[in-house]
């Protein structure tokens, strides 16, 4: 009788399966890592070193897989690693994404609409080809588990092999690795899915510390005093436009060849600041930092919610605080203030300007509607209004503006940015800046309608910049340690009808640290914590 043997009837040792998965991940999830490594160490002169890197990555991958994989969770763990490798490598290879804790926090706060913008055919092809199909093979594989004693020996042997693969290359090329880790340290952040796994563990530790942290607010401005009251002068009405994803080198006032802010160019008395650096490279990190007393050197995004911020101080002193948000949310900035002072403008519930485009995306200008009612309800009071933009949020820049701002053509109308002709990507991004220009100009126009009764002022600062394909990097979110300047150099503008608010010199080197003292000065508030800190006004 003829026997028939199907491939799925053959069994496989669990440690062989782990090795195959580790090899697959090392080979398919790290294309960007090897590309970055070879850019620093050309293959023509460093073939041995590059090969040693590949072996070391395989060793590290095997070590991680073996550490996480045990009999009763073997297949779920391997499948999870395969899916994670496919997803993380797609965004790394496509957008240059690096998975540090800040990026993970930003990803967790990404809403459904933003996630949809990142989904495309290439994404699903990658996930199916490098994630789902290998996972199916793992799921149907028949695993021949050894006895407990043999399994322990085989696990130890596999650990030994992984350590040999990891350490021997480092030993053979020790001088080059010493230089690599010292001078080119950022390149290692591109290793997937090891970096995401490490960052998940680190983030879990951070979240645990937050969960066990004291809930009492840590005050930084108990000594804050308002030196003049609205009863002694004209009350102040200030709009702070919290920008999104605008970069300084695409602003005409900073030498850019295009008129991306033509309406602001016509505003008398507008001050531009050309040398401003953001606190971070993501909304989740930068926005709380923009209102912090700590300054970016001492700022900790994980404990920011427990810290008094400048809005808490101004609210305590009687300044009316209002936050309207067409982005994600206030990132914790408004958490300690009454919910009645925060309004979501990302849906038609509050935003009346959502049907001007094919995407039914609510526009930033909708946040201006109805502000007169707020002013009337707080007549004679100092007021600070935050307008948090959608701005230039990527990758779907073409969705961020209406047809009247489509000045630069053709435009990239997709979210696979690397596949777009580079100039079309720039065109879409610059058109979105034209919409921001219009929004800021309209904010100033609205303030001017209240000049008779208020000293009015407008401050605009973007939360971070954006990479548009420079060196193969797109979007934002890179760790500060090696973020390109495009992700941290941001535009900032100031305008007021009050001539006593003298803007700082345009080329003054400033950071997001200048925002808190500026907001205090606009309401004649002094606080020792920031009394010597540079501001946008003198």
Swiss-Prot record:
Superkingdom of this protein's organism: Bacteria
Cystine pairs: 279-289, 354-362, 412-420
Pfam families: EptA_B_N (PF08019), Sulfatase (PF00884)
Substitution effect: residue 476 to A: Abolishes transfer of phosphoethanolamine (PEA) to a lipid A analog in vitro. Reduces resistance of E.coli to colistin about 8-fold, by comparison with the same strain expressing wild-type mcr-2
Subcellular location: Cell inner membrane
Catalysed reaction, written as an equation: lipid A (E. coli) + a 1,2-diacyl-sn-glycero-3-phosphoethanolamine + H(+) = lipid A 4'-(2-aminoethyl diphosphate) (E. coli) + a 1,2-diacyl-sn-glycerol
Keywords tagged on the record: Antibiotic resistance, Cell inner membrane, Cell membrane, Disulfide bond, Membrane, Metal-binding, Phosphoprotein, Plasmid, Transferase, Transmembrane, Transmembrane helix, Zinc
Any one GO biological process: lipopolysaccharide core region biosynthetic process
GO molecular function: metal ion binding; phosphotransferase activity, phosphate group as acceptor
PTM annotation (Phosphothreonine): residues: 283
InterPro entries: Alkaline_phosphatase_core_sf, EptA-like_N, PEA_transferase, Sulfatase_N
Membrane topology: Multi-pass membrane protein
Consequence of changing residue 106 to A: No affect on transfer of phosphoethanolamine (PEA) to a lipid A analog in vitro. No affect on resistance of E.coli to colistin, by comparison with the same strain expressing wild-type mcr-2
Membrane spanning stretches: 14-34, 47-67, 72-92, 121-141, 161-181
Gene3D superfamilies: Alkaline Phosphatase, subunit A
Database matches in PROSITE patterns: ADH_SHORT (PS00061)
GO cellular component terms, semicolon-separated: plasma membrane
Residues at which Zn(2+) binds: 244, 283, 463-464
PTM description: Phosphorylated at Thr-283; may represent an intermediate in the catalytic mechanism.
Function: Probably catalyzes the addition of a phosphoethanolamine moiety to lipid A. Phosphoethanolamine modification of lipid A confers polymyxin resistance. Confers resistance to polymyxin-type antibiotics such as colistin.
PANTHER family for the chain: INNER MEMBRANE PROTEIN (PTHR30443), PHOSPHOETHANOLAMINE TRANSFERASE EPTA (PTHR30443:SF0)
Entry-linked NCBIfam families: P_eth_NH2_trans (NF028537), polymyxin_MCR2 (NF012159)
Quaternary structure note: Monomer.
Designated name of the protein: Phosphatidylethanolamine transferase Mcr-2
Source species: Escherichia coli
Gene: mcr2
